[in-house]
């Protein structure tokens, strides 16, 4: 009890964590529909591992086993004592506290991978993600204190540290190859790389296991670099800066508010501040059974007289410590006090309304916690959802129809389930003779013991002394509705990303300058090159003056080309990466075929390879000189031949039908139309057989241009030939003298010319994007996203052009001196 009191937390213990660590995702997802946020961690001590291996090599006896157990237990107690005294003594956890247990590797020999001796734990943090990062913080500090420790930590999303530092990670790191490669050591992140060549596969396997990873991290003889860059560590430290500078403990962990509660409850929360977490979460997630207990209020009746439990019924306004998350959950709950409460709540405008309302919620929450603990009795501390043996036992009960097809959650189902849980725990206690974890006192017994441990006067004195050191906190942060803060966070993230990109560009520029400095270039060649550059610059200036007249058309063409180049970028399932042109690939560091990279290793330039392939395909596509189409091998032409054969049969049938039609007295012009259709159809088939793919596509375009769909595209704005201008003039001047047949001929000529007009792809692209932007009405959408990516890509190119132009300045100076 004293240890729990000093740690500021109700004792909470977990069984079978080693099974839950490996199978926790499946257990939690199958047991609960909603996702449960949890973090799981393992602490390996290289000294303990070596000590255990040495004992295994010797003859095993009872003395060695006892010494080994003593050493492991002492190390665990040393770690716990350090963490409690320096970090978690007064920490209020949202759901579950940080906890460590010894991994009994001797009982896990049936597993495929036998892990070495270590300590492990699991913590559910639910709404408060700060608990997760606080655990990362204390584990980092723990590895600084004990440099023999190596820590692995994951959550329900996997390697969440990699997710946090994703913007600075090497390109080779993927979710599929990062398993068992990420660890904390000496207060920093360590990532075991992939093998850089096949000779390293023995020491660095592609599929990493825990034992191999520990041997790599603990060995100083190998040349494997596992320490990540300073940039990655800085991102993690920036995420944990609230813990390092103490801001989190002063504000988020220390929300002090006045509450009018019974004296006994005030004293209870003063001695065990962690209970406020159980009170808040139980009140927040209350069910129908909890609401029934509120209607009676048997344990904490709000009356003026002393009850059977010894409660005085006197209220005291005292300072209660919350976390900001817990206070927000309790404060924002709409709740009216029950009718049996005395006295009733004042009006919201009353000065004491906030303290009275908060006190009523605390009283009701504690009543729920007390009765829920008493209902569960002996099973209150056992976490059945995390016990694989219990889950298997429950499956057997269901298969034997123990619940008699009762609905889950019904009263009879709960009664049977409670009986099964109690019987399961009793069997475990009887079967485990060497059980060192004795059954702890349940919460309701703890509440009874603490509230009756001192007199009312003594409790009042303790509360008054405690209130002197507590200053009530403001809750203005709870009512903030300033959207600018969210924008500030986004801009801060963007600024950090831009700074990192600038650092990378500066490093690349320095590497290029170093390479250029090593090259020796003759002065004559430099002078000639400089003269040529000057001439080229003059020519470029003249060309720029000539191009100013066509700014409008160039803007559209440039926009279209940028859009096309953006869409032509290679994308993987990780997203689009805007790579530079293939000409710059020479300046990039060579990446290894195995992903890790090296100077002397076999390299594979994927960008250059794709450019070569793209060049082949571009040269062969729509080539006018390529006339070697093999019609026989093309399925389309086989279909045409089959179509022609069927046409011959149809023609014979049509001839017979035509004879019948003549006998029936059909008119001649109908027969002529049918003959024309047959002739056109025959010509079309002949055209398909003799034409190439390109001609076939052009013919299809001509047919589509005659349809309605042609009006939906913008055509190129070219001037009509002189013949059409003359036709239009003659139509205007001699409109009354021209017959209708001539008009039809002119209109057909105009239509034929329009059919041959090309679609202005650039103008259509700009038009469609502008229409899409107007439809977005200022909100985010696909068009704005594409334009943003284009602007980012162009800004990078401009910066590179500026840097390249700056490098030419000293060369021009040399030319002037030589002249």
Curated annotation (Swiss-Prot):
Biased composition (Low complexity): 501-514, 524-551, 581-592, 730-740
Region (Disordered): 494-558, 578-603, 617-680, 725-749, 778-819
GO cellular component labels: nucleus
Keywords: Activator, Transcription, Transcription regulation
Feature: compositional bias, Basic residues: 797-819
UniProt feature, compositional bias: Acidic residues: 624-680
Annotated InterPro entries: Ecd (IPR010770)
Function: May act as a transcriptional activator.
Family: Belongs to the ECD family.
PANTHER family with a match to the protein in the record: PROTEIN ECDYSONELESS HOMOLOG, SGT1 PROTEIN HSGT1 SUPPRESSOR OF GCR2
Protein name as annotated: Protein ecdysoneless homolog
Organism: Dictyostelium discoideum (Social amoeba)
Name of the encoding gene: ecd
């Amino acid at each position: 009890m004293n240890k729990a009191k000093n740690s500021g937390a109700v004792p909470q213990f977990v069984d079978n964590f080693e099974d839950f660590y490996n199978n926790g995702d499946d257990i939690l997802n199958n047991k609960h529909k909603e996702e449960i946020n949890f973090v799981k961690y393992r602490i390996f001590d290289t000294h303990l591992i070596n000590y255990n291996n040495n004992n295994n090599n010797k003859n095993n006896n009872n003395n060695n086993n006892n010494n080994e157990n003593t050493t492991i237990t002492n190390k665990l107690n040393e770690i716990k004592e350090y963490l409690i005294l320096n970090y978690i003594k007064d920490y209020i956890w949202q759901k579950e506290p940080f906890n460590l247990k010894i991994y009994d590797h001797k009982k896990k020999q049936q597993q495929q991978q036998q892990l070495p001796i270590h300590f492990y734990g699991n913590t559910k943090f639910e709404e408060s993600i700060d608990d997760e990062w606080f655990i990362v913080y204390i584990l980092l500090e723990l590895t600084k204190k004990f440099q023999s420790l190596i820590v692995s930590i994951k959550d329900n999303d996997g390697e969440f540290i990699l997710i946090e530092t994703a913007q600075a990670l090497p390109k080779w790191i993927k979710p599929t190859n990062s398993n068992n490669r990420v660890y904390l050591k000496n207060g920093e992140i360590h990532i075991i790389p992939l093998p850089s060549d096949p000779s390293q596969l023995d020491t660095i396997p592609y599929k990493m296991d825990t034992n191999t990873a520990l041997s790599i991290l603990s060995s100083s003889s190998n040349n494997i670099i596992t320490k990540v860059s300073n940039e990655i560590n800085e991102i993690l430290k920036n995420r944990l800066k609230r813990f390092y500078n103490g801001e989190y403990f002063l504000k988020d962990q220390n929300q002090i508010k006045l509450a009018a509660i019974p004296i006994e409850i005030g004293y209870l929360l003063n001695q065990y501040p962690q209970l406020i977490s159980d009170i808040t979460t139980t009140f927040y997630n209350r069910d129908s059974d909890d609401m029934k207990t509120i209607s009676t209020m048997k344990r904490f009746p709000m009356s003026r007289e002393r009850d059977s439990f010894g409660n005085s019924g006197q209220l005291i306004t005292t300072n209660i410590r919350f976390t900001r998350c817990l206070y927000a959950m309790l404060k924002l709950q709409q709740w009216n006090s029950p009718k049996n409460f005395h006295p009733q709540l004042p009006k919201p405008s009353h000065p004491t309304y906030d303290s009275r309302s908060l006190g009523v919620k605390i009283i009701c929450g504690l009543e729920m916690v007390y009765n829920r603990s008493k209902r569960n009795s002996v099973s209150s501390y056992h976490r059945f959802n995390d016990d694989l043996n219990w889950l298997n036992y429950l499956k057997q009960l269901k298969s034997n129809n123990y619940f008699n097809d009762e609905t889950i959650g019904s009263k009879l189902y709960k009664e049977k389930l409670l009986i099964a849980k109690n019987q399961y725990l009793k069997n475990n206690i009887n079967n485990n003779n060497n059980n060192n974890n004795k059954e702890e006192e349940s919460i309701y017994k703890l509440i009874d013991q603490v509230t009756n441990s001192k007199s009312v006067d003594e409790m009042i004195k303790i509360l008054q002394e405690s209130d002197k050191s507590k200053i009530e906190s403001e809750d203005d942060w709870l009512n903030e509705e300033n959207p600018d803060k969210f924008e500030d966070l986004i801009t801060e993230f963007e600024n950090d990303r831009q700074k990192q990109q600038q650092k990378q560009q500066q490093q690349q520029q320095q590497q290029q300058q170093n390479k250029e400095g090593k090259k020796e270039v003759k002065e004559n060649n430099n002078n000639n090159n400089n003269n040529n550059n000057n001439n080229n610059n003059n020519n470029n200036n003249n060309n720029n003056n000539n191009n100013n007249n066509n700014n409008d058309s160039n803007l559209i063409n440039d926009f279209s080309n940028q859009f096309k180049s953006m869409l032509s970028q290679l994308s993987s399932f990780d997203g689009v990466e805007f790579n530079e042109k293939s000409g710059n690939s020479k300046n990039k560091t060579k990446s290894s075929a195995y992903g890790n990279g090296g100077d002397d290793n076999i390299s594979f330039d994927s960008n250059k390879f794709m450019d070569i392939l793209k060049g082949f395909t571009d040269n062969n596509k729509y080539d006018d000189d390529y006339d070697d189409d093999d019609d026989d091998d093309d399925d389309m032409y086989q279909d045409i031949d089959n179509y022609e054969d069927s046409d011959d049969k149809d023609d014979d049938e049509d001839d017979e039908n035509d004879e019948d039609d003549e006998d029936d007295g059909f008119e001649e012009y109908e027969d002529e139309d049918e003959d024309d259709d047959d002739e056109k159809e025959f010509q079309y088939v002949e055209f398909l057989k003799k034409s190439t793919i390109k001609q076939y596509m052009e013919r299809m375009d001509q047919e589509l241009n005659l349809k309605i769909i042609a009006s939906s595209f913008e055509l190129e704005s070219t001037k009509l030939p002189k013949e059409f201008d003359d036709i239009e003039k003659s139509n205007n001047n001699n409109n009354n003298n021209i017959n209708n047949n001539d008009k039809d001929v002119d209109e057909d000529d105009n239509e034929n010319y329009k059919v041959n007009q090309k679609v202005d792809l650039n103008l259509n692209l700009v038009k469609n994007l502008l229409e899409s932007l107007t439809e977005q009405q200022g909100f985010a959408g696909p068009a704005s996203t594409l334009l943003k990516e284009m602007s980012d890509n162009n800004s990078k190119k401009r910066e590179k052009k500026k840097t390249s132009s700056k490098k030419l300045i000293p060369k021009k100076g040399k030319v002037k001196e030589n002249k």
